[in-house]
Amino acid sequence: MMRAYLCCSAALLLLASVPAPAQRARDLGIPFDGTPGPWNAITDVAGIEVGHTTLIEGDSVRTGVTVIWPRGRQSDDPTFGGWFALNGNGEMTGTTWVEESGFVDSPIFITNTHSVGTVRDSYIRWQADHHRRPGTNSVGDGFWSLPIVAETYDGFLNDTNGQHVQPQHVFDAIEHARSGPVGEGNVGGGTGMICFGFKGGIGTSSRVAGKYHVAALVQCNCGSKRQLTIAGVPVGRELDRPTVASIPKPLEDRGSIIIVIATDAPLLPTQTKRLARRASLGLARLGSVSGNGSGDIFIAFSTANPKAAQPSGELASVSMLPNDALGPIFEATVQATEEAIVNAMVAARDMTGVSGHTVTALPHDGLKQTLQKYNRLAQPAAR
């Protein structure tokens, strides 16, 4: 059977480090506040690397895995971090230790709901095989690893009970993580996701906040079409043609979103947790109410203060922004989150999956016409 997941190394590299899509939200003239970084991606925070493995096979496999390395895949140096669940009907492993220690001590993986265990165990196997040790949990020749793996449910388009994500797919995402443009839409863990009634997936965006950068990467699988609001315009209500074939109504309240916030601003763990909370406001700008069945789980980290987990002496010296200086960082978080979600939808393409279910993408022309109707269409961004 022909597979969209190709096994030769050259093809894997293409899948794992694809450039940003030809069109993103700003290219359509969608107005956003704030100034993005050069890539308008989470990789604008120096050192971060992102990898995807995308699985599209036959009529029913529509899934994958995405990995974010806070300091790049060559580093095991933890970052200060914190997490927040806006609504907890979901999973992000490793967060008990994040809460306790204040450190993000592994790459952050995102996949489908029923592949969390495979991804977690595969990363531990990769650590053991490559003699990589966590920065906080190692004694002598031994270590114990508590990887961070998050999920959203892709069962409308993917045979999620088939658990098609295998260890080699995790290894490939790890090994081919790169800086620079980040693939969006139907890639990695976002391959089979649905966002506000349209095809969703992976999206990213960044902001410049003074001399610092703040960025978001999302796996968007939440919301109903009637909620979708872009640039203050009720886009979902205006674009009322069917976009999801026979999706059960209760599923509208049971989607989820994973949001990863990164910054190079010097923040303490309690401050990164405050950043994670602000991602909620970016999501709310688009109309989400975070329903009872939704797993809306966010994690934030700061790449400042290297070696804070392994001080050379009895005392560790770290730097931090005063709380009174966090306003621009909070604002940038909200802005980057909002745009990352829209970028996921703009990049996504129509998809047919398991049981013949079809989800169509957000129509670019219809979106532009709707924004124009409300006098909210801007000049497309220069490329």
List the model feature ranges, each with a label:
Residues M1-C8:
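Bacterial N-terminal signal peptides that target proteins for export
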Residues L12-L15:
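Hydrophobic alpha-helical segments of integral membrane proteins
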Residues S17-P19:
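N-terminal signal peptide c-region/cleavage motif recognized by signal peptidases
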Residues A22-R383:
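Alpha/propeptide regions of enzymes that mature by internal proteolysis
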